[in-house]
Amino acid sequence: MMNFLRRAVSSSKRSELIRIISVATATSGILYASTNPDARTRVSLAIPESVRESLSLLPWQISPGLIHRPEQSLFGNFVFSSRVSPKSEAPINDEKGVSVEASDSSSKPSNGYLGRDTIANAAARIGPAVVNLSVPQGFHGISMGKSIGSGTIIDADGTILTCAHVVVDFQNIRHSSKGRVDVTLQDGRTFEGVVVNADLQSDIALVKIKSKTPLPTAKLGFSSKLRPGDWVIAVGCPLSLQNTVTAGIVSCVDRKSSDLGLGGKHREYLQTDCSINAGNSGGPLVNLDGEVIGVNIMKVLAADGLGFSVPIDSVSKIIEHFKKSGRVIRPWIGLKMVELNNLIVAQLKERDPMFPDVERGVLVPTVIPGSPADRAGFKPGDVVVRFDGKPVIEIMDDRVGKRMQVVVERSNKERVTLEVIPEEANPDM
């Protein structure tokens, strides 16, 4: 190992340096490397402690920070930078332009490397803004316990993002609750909050608290940037255990409600394997930057590692509806729809050879009499292939009262374009 490292210092060729260190670490450590277009190569090398001690004997000008502190990691992190560039950068030791520098990257994901403190740092960023919610329950004035959940403070005015089922009585109140919500912060402060908006269909609600002192807030990220396999953390108060952090990965970025056997409206969730339990509802799903990318909503009771969250991009649209109209306005055209894929299309064509020759789309099995779709000329069996110029129907778009063109395929390869004007959906439908 030491001979390899000495050769690395005397090497002026970037490719040779990478080869030397790669071979040296094959049985002695862990290597990460990346090359960018400006001819800089950065190699991060994790070296066992036994070898680390010997490195201090090499004839290098080693700064005190180069030897990694044992309490930070089981392995020390060394970053070697080979600079093959005409820039006037002063090398540390030799005449060939090769230098050795230190970098403490244990807390940052570098080139796919999850540092020791990465999750802890993300949890520390979001933690102060995560709250415990407690809603007294009763029947005709008789106390019947409390509903427990979690939430996230998203602005300095004291707006808390949570789930509707945590703060709304689904049996007796359909749209919103003006009842009391007890809010407890991570630092122990308690407040009395009020539900200001709730949307039962998406299961998203906003609670408001007032504070004379500054409140911690969380930053909202973008769920559209997520990929299956990305690391995420769930923070909340499962079983009233405040400040609980669990970690996992994104299993699916667009799990459909129909896949979960949930009837009614079309919805999509983020699926993760983070541990989510009773009391986690309403708490944030967070990326490694400490940004909220989802609202934890439910888990599958019959299995472990199947948790679901409302994507923050959808939540942001709901919040905009709340600000603009005080409620979520959804278009309704009066169609029962079934989303098609290749498998379903193949099965339908086996039953009926005249079924439209499409790869994807939305099947219309039912048209509600007297609805906008009925007036526009939709028929049962139509397959919607384009909706207002787009290949899919975007459920959350505010299109009420706007004339739209819908392209449908019918039997015998018939294609027609229909015009429909959506009405506002009844929230109780």
UniProtKB/Swiss-Prot annotation:
Gene3D superfamilies: 2.30.42.10, 2.40.10.120. Residues 113-338 are annotated as: Serine protease. Its EC number is 3.4.21.-. The keyword Electron transport does not apply. Residues 318-424 form the PDZ domain. CDD domains: cpPDZ_AtDEGP14-like. PROSITE patterns: PDZ. GO terms for molecular function: serine-type endopeptidase activity. SMART domains: PDZ. One of its GO terms (biological process) is proteolysis. Residues 87-113 are annotated as: Disordered. Coiled coil: none annotated. Keywords: Hydrolase, Protease, Serine protease. It is an enzyme of class 3 (hydrolase). The active site is at H165, D203, S281. Belongs to the peptidase S1C family. Putative serine protease. This is Putative protease Do-like 14. It comes from Arabidopsis thaliana (Mouse-ear cress).
